[in-house]
Structures are given as structure tokens and as C-alpha cells.
Curated annotation (Swiss-Prot):
It comes from Xanthobacter flavus. This is HTH-type transcriptional regulator CbbR. SUPFAM superfamilies: Periplasmic binding protein-like II, Winged helix' DNA-binding domain. GO terms for molecular function: DNA-binding transcription factor activity; transcription cis-regulatory region binding. The gene is cbbR. Belongs to the LysR transcriptional regulatory family.
Length: 333
């Protein structure tokens, strides 16, 4: 026999779980507490097991309650998708796109999105910034229509469109003693320096650890863990250490002479910027238009590194005359 659950009951379950109180759930829904209690009692009678237990005076979902919560989230997401799809059918030229962007991409993604909005002002964009783990979670949960990041994990079934290359380098204070060294610098040499690194879960951190491991210097000593590229740059300029970092995040500082690029063996490591969407995510015309735009024109918004000292190692060959940069397959962002 099919259950007699209602959308209102499932919504009340979600509100009660979030607030830990039927009274607060009633307030949020504009109902009286007795009405909510009656709804929850009817739902528990229908499923035959308790949905909540009281712990320290708060409601906590049981295993059955967690199952209902998961179902409610899926249903709410499906209804939201249906609402957006219907709106797109009524006005195909309009729409909205939720865009997840890894934090390192904020040095070009806003400019690209602004250009897209100028061309398609009728499309609403919502921008969400996070580290690699945050963005992957948003793709898996189907919260994002499009994500701007590096290559997604192989287990994640996704469509990807290439935006452009993404080089990684090591930067240092302009007066660092290593710039006077005649011998070529290796990653192993850097283990004797103070390294400023991103937090675990950051694609830059993952890639840095891979570079050191492949160079035979795993687990490099970390002087400071910093969750912001901006703070890392300021810390390097202040003389606190060296940083393995995206070249796109330091283009302005290198051009202005506030940071210098160390010539390190095996660097730069080049990965790719991609526009990504989950294959399970229904992409409406507005999202498809953004994917097409990023593939076609996204590379033009990538920061350009200066030539000359340091810059020659990661400018394109036709600009710098340098040897090709090292490319790493399946690089994280």
C-alpha cells in the first residue's frame, strides 16, 4: 500500500530536524504547535516507527527520520528543477544559472561571468565560491548548474568543457637568497625553506603534495597553513616563506615586482580550467549558453603572466620562446 505522506509533512520533518523543536517548525510554517504535533503523529503512525528522539531537550532524527529527510531533500530539489524548467519553457530566452567556482578561479571567473551577463542580461547568475571539496559536493548534490574548476574526480560522472591552461609555480620574496643561486633549484631544495600552503581539500594543496612526492620529497615541512590565496601572497611578500601557487593568482604582483617566480625543476605544472556539470543535472538553455560561452571565450579572461625574468618559464612558447611547461594529467583544482 502506498504511503499517505504529504509534502507538508515532509517539510515539517525537515524544519523540526533543523530546529530541534516542533514548536519552531510550527512557527516557520505558520501553523499552531498542536497542528504540527498531530501531523507528525499521523506520519509516525503511517510509517510505523518513530522519526525523532529527544536528546538533551532537542529533537534528533532517528534512522527512519534520516531516510525521510533524504527523501524530502530529493523531492525539494526535483520540484525546484521542475519550476525552473517550466519557467524556461514559458520564456526560453530567460533563466537562471547557479555557478560554483573554486576559490582560485575568482581571479578570472567574475570577469568572464560579467561579460556573459552583458551579452545575456536576461539570464540571472548566482555565484558560489568554495574550495575544491566544496565545489565537488555541490556538483554531486546537483546544487550547481555549472562549475568552474579543474578536472573532476574520475568517479564523478560529468560533462567537461575546456576553458584554458592553468600553470602553477613557486613564488618568493623578491630578495630571497635562492635567486642568487647558480645551481638549478629542485623541489627537494624547497623542503629546507618555509612553505606557506593552502588548507587540506584545496586543489592547490593536493597538486603541491603530488609535485613533491613525484620529485622524491614527500611530506614537505609546512611552516604555515593558510586558507586564502590573498593572505598567502601577502605573507610571501612579508618574507614569511615561499608558496606553491596558481600563476593566475599572482600575475599582478609579479608584473609589479612585488613577487618573483623561482625557476624550479619540473615547474610550472600545467593543469586545465574546465566548465563542469554533473551528467545527472538537467541543463536548461541558460546553463547551456554559459557552458558554450566559457568554452568559446573563457580563455580570454585568464590573467596573463609577464615575460622576462621568471615569466619566461610559463608563458606560451610563441610568446616566451621557452621550453614547454610540464603537463600533469588528471590534475585537481
Amino acid at each position: 500500500m502506498a504511503p499517505h505522506w504529504t509534502l507538508r509533512q515532509l517539510r515539517l520533518v525537515a524544519l523540526a530536524a533543523a530546529s530541534g523543536s516542533y514548536a519552531k517548525a510550527a512557527q516557520d510554517m505558520g501553523l499552531s504547535p498542536p497542528a504540527v504535533t498531530a501531523q507528525m503523529k499521523a506520519l509516525e503512525e503511517d510509517i510505523g516507527v518513530p522519526m525523532f528522539e529527544r536528546v538533551d531537550g532537542r529533537l534528533r532524527p532517528t534512522a527512519a527520520g534520516q531516510e525521510l529527510l533524504s527523501a524530502q531533500e530529493r523531492i525539494a530539489r526535483a520540484l525546484s528543477e521542475a519550476e525552473r524548467a517550466i519557467a524556461a519553457l514559458k520564456s526560453p530566452e530567460r533563466g537562471s544559472v547557479v555557478v560554483g567556482v573554486v576559490s582560485t578561479a575568482k581571479y578570472f571567473a567574475p570577469m568572464a561571468l560579467a561579460a556573459f551577463r552583458r551579452r545575456r542580461p536576461e539570464i540571472e547568475l548566482r555565484l558560489i565560491i568554495g574550495n575544491r571539496e566544496d565545489i565537488i559536493r555541490g556538483i554531486v548534490s546537483l546544487d550547481f548548474d555549472v562549475a568552474i574548476m579543474g578536472r573532476p574526480p574520475p568517479a564523478l560522472e560529468a560533462e567537461t568543457r575546456l576553458i584554458g591552461d592553468h600553470p602553477h609555480i613557486v613564488v618568493a620574496p623578491v630578495d630571497h637568497p635562492l635567486f642568487k643561486r647558480r645551481k638549478r633549484i629542485t623541489p627537494a631544495d624547497l623542503t629546507r625553506e618555509s612553505l606557506l600552503v593552502r588548507e587540506p581539500g584545496s586543489g592547490t594543496r593536493i597538486l603541491m603534495e603530488r609535485v613533491f612526492e613525484e620529485a622524491g620529497a614527500p611530506n614537505p615541512p609546512i611552516a604555515m597553513e593558510i586558507g586564502s590565496n590573498e593572505t598567502i601572497k601577502q605573507s610571501v611578500m612579508a618574507g614569511l616563506g615561499l608558496a606553491f601557487i596558481s600563476a593566475h593568482t599572482v600575475a599582478a604582483e609579479v608584473a609589479d615586482g612585488r613577487l618573483r617566480v623561482l625557476e624550479v625543476e619540473g615547474l610550472p605544472v600545467v593543469r586545465q580550467w574546465l566548465a563542469v556539470r554533473a551528467r545527472d543535472k538537467r541543463l536548461l538553455p541558460a546553463g547551456q549558453a554559459l557552458m558554450d560561452f566559457l568554452e568559446r571565450e573563457g580563455a580570454s579572461f585568464l590573467p596573463q603572466m609577464p615575460g622576462g625574468e621568471g615569466g619566461r618559464c610559463y608563458l606560451p612558447d610563441h610568446v616566451s620562446g621557452s621550453t614547454p611547461a610540464k603537463a600533469v594529467a588528471r590534475d585537481p583544482v
